[in-house]
Amino acid sequence: MDLKLPIRSTVYHTEKTLQRLRFFSQPANLPILLGISFPKSGTHLLDQILLGFSKVAPYARRVHSFYAEYEGESGVKRVPEQALRWLDSLRPRDVASAHLFARPEAVARVCSPKFVPYFIFRDPRDVVVSHVFYVTEMEARHVHHAYYASLPDFETRLRVSILGRADPSTGSGQARFEFPNIAARFAPYLNWLNQPEVLTIHFEDLIQDRVRTLNRILDHFLARVPLPTPRSRILDCLEASINPSKSPTFRSGKTGEWKKYFTAEHKTIFKEVAGDLLLKLGYEKDNNW
């Protein structure tokens, strides 16, 4: 048994109790703050911002838990019921984070009074570049690390991140994991864009237009959780909560870096498999890029 788990749980709930005492005049049944993200799209940045609300309301001071649709080390895809059990395990005033598919059952839960949900995503071209660096250099336990490390160069790895990887099979012929092309990887998240209860955030807006984007995040929160605290004070808390040095997977936080790494071939294959995705997400108006 991992002794760290019960210790972390005890610390978490103790801090939540202290937060409740600190903000005793505010309701105890405030909705859960849920940050949904596409992988490599600013997960920890959004986590930090949402935790900034703990300075002005009785929210937890750390993320309750993180859920991902795939197990990082094995690459095994979790069954839909696991996501629902995780969502049901969350309690009022929690702050939680997830790479969560927009399946109908999950959407029904998240788009309910129980949650204040946010969805952050990033230019998929930057995502595939970030993915190469992360898998190759930052996470040796990742299911794809050994394979990426075996490839001859960055260009080849980037090609795999765009096109995906054929499923290696077990002795029984069953695929061990799935890693389709970038458009297919994003497809299960697309329905979050259609939910008015979910605030969608371009990662780039938090880098290039942070003040306006933090105001949008705050407005979405205040629509459900009215606070007596001055708006300027809340915004200062959200801004102060951002600390890239505390992100375990932070690399550069820059936008448009794909332009430094994409060759003509990368552009061609990306347009073939994910050109429409860029249009849907608002990153391009056509394929002439």
Predicted regions: what is each one?
Residues 2-154, 164-201, 265-268, 272-276, ...:
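PAPS-dependent sulfotransferase catalytic domain
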Residues 59-78, 194-264, 268, 272:
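The conserved 3'-phosphoadenosine-5'-phosphosulfate
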Residues 148-161, 235-237, 243:
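A short, conserved beta-to-alpha structural element at the edge of catalytic cores
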Residues 250-254, 284-289:
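Short coil/turn segments at secondary-structure boundaries
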